[in-house]
UniProtKB/Swiss-Prot annotation:
Keywords from the UniProt entry: Cytoplasm, Nucleus, Phosphoprotein
Name by which UniProt lists this protein: Protein HRI1
Family, similarity comment: Belongs to the HRI1 family.
One of the record's GO cellular component terms: cytoplasm
Gene3D superfamilies, per the entry: Protein HRI1, C-terminal domain, Protein HRI1, N-terminal domain
UniProt subcellular location: Cytoplasm; Nucleus
Quaternary data: Interacts with HRR25. May interact with SEC72.
Name of the gene this protein is made from: HRI1
């Protein structure tokens, strides 16, 4: 079942906060992307207005159901903007997380990273997520009474890997998120992101568009099938998942 989650809270240390409009998309087959743009970027943030962004296929995450509403997820991100940009004091390697369902329908994520090295002191973090209905234009919460939610929302994933680019687009219902990165660039000039919302009118609205090559990311997702190829401004994308 596909999922769309909005982050409500981020906490490192004693003071929780939320400065971003973070949405994470998870496809039916387990591919994922999380875009975390600042709501009110300032100063140096204006040139790259993201707290973080990451993405990966289902081959880059290990999911284990622990029972009683607890799931562990261990990530080896395909794209990690902090790693891509060589940000100082960045965790490298697998990130281990634990997800716990709350009675309210929210999901608590906890974990730890090692920004100073695997043999150094860890930094714990906590995030709170609200599942939302991907078939709706508005951010309508899912299962407020902890009822099981079954979604018929479409789940489509496109991927590009060639000598020059990596990229992933995930369509969950009406909500589309994607990235495209230039290989061997490792600057903000090599990063591109989109967030689109398909409207009742049949048109798509850009909620986020970042990067000089964003037009190489597909923005139409009709008449596709698994294994087919979509070309966007000369760049070929493979449809690796199609449930619609």
């Amino acid at each position: 079942m596909p999922a769309l989650l909005k982050r409500l809270l981020f906490q490192v240390g004693p003071h929780p906060n939320e400065r971003t409009f973070t949405l994470s998309s998870v496809s039916t087959d387990g591919h994922y992307i999380s875009l975390r743009p600042f709501v009110k970027p300032s100063g140096d943030e204006l040139s790259f207005p993201f707290e973080w962004a990451f993405a990966g296929t289902n081959e880059t995450v290990k999911v284990n159901d622990q029972g009683n509403g607890v799931v562990t997820q261990d990530f080896n991100f395909w794209l990690d903007t902090n790693v891509y940009l060589n940000v100082p004091n960045t965790h490298r390697g697998e990130v281990n997380t634990t997800w716990k369902n709350w009675d309210s329908g929210c999901v608590e994520e906890t974990g730890a990273v090692y920004p100073f090295g695997a043999d150094k002191e860890s930094v714990s973090f906590r995030e709170l997520w609200q599942p939302v209905d991907p078939s709706r234009e508005d951010l309508v919460i899912v299962s407020p009474n902890n009822e099981k939610f079954s979604s018929n929302a479409r789940s489509i994933v496109l991927k590009v890997t060639d000598e020059a680019y990596d990229g992933l687009v995930i369509v969950i219902g009406r909500w589309i998120q994607g990235f495209l990165s230039q290989k061997n660039n490792n600057t903000i000039e090599g990063l591109n992101f989109i967030r689109l919302l398909x409207k009742d009118s049949g048109k798509s609205e850009f909620l986020l568009s970042y990067g000089k090559e964003v037009n190489k990311i597909p923005q139409s997702y009709e008449n596709l099938k698994k294994g087919s190829t979509v070309t966007s401004n000369g760049l070929n994308w493979e449809v690796i998942e199609y449930h619609a």
